[in-house]
Amino acid sequence: MKIWTSEHIFNHPWETVTQAAWRKYPNPMTPSIIGTDVVERRVVDGVLHTHRLVQSKWYFPKWTHALIGTAKTCFASERSTVDPERKQMVLKTNNLTFCRNISVDEVLYYEPHPSDASKTLLKQEATVTVFGVPLSHYMEDLLTSTISTNAGKGRQGLEWVIGLINTEVKGIARGTDELLHNTRRSIDEVTESARKSMDEISAQAAKAAKAMHIT
């Protein structure tokens, strides 16, 4: 059994990072993750519970095919909880494919940085166990190395999604500013038109009154 752990600090608040975590896949940094499907989602005592199925591609060396078999597509089960009051997001993932010989249990914790609330601390832990096949320790090292590499790509992917979200927010803000500007301009135009109409009516009334007085 191999245990891998890692910590990373995002220079973004917890709300932004967790929002990006839901939209993390697909992204160009982790093309091995094909997509996710929501199996179940419910809220219990203010905590969001979600069960998703993750579809991915794992590229094992050819020499492992005779030991564990082959699969073009791999599946994993992801169960998560999000507590907005305590600002905690926990994701637990375990593999479904190759589960007769391989067990990969991964846990991710997202929480505000203890000394800087404007940042988010990510803690990751993966437990890898290979059993029932030769060279199990070597395969555990191989899988652990792959997990470490993919974790780095995953963090890059999350930053990419955060950038996308920030761009969307700026676009919405810009659109709102344009809408307010156009609305103000329309109101000014209507006000000016009404003022001119009132001036014309007043002028015509004065002209008519003057004509009646002369007559």
Swiss-Prot record:
Disulfide bonds: none annotated. One of its GO terms (biological process) is larval locomotory behavior. It holds the Pfam family PRELI. InterPro entries: PRELI/MSF1_dom, Slowmo/Ups. GO terms for cellular component: mitochondrial intermembrane space; mitochondrion. Expressed in specific tissues such as the developing central nervous system (CNS) and both the male and female germline. In the CNS, it is restricted in a subset of cells during embryogenesis and early larval development. In embryos, it is also expressed in salivary glands. In the testis, expressed in somatic cyst cells throughout the distal region where the mitotic cysts develop, extending through to meiotic cysts. PROSITE patterns: PRELI_MSF1. Keywords: Developmental protein, Differentiation, Mitochondrion, Oogenesis, Spermatogenesis. It is found in: Mitochondrion. GO terms for molecular function: phosphatidic acid transfer activity. Disruption phenotype: Flies have defects in locomotor behavior and die during larval development, due to abnormal neural function. Mutant males lacking functional slmo survive into adulthood and show an early division of the germline but never progress through the gonial divisions. Mutant females demonstrate germarial degeneration and reduced fertility. The keyword Chloroplast does not apply. Residues 1-170 form the PRELI/MSF1 domain. Belongs to the slowmo family. Required to regulate peristaltic movement and also for germline proliferation in males and females. This is Protein slowmo. It comes from Drosophila melanogaster (Fruit fly). The gene is slmo.
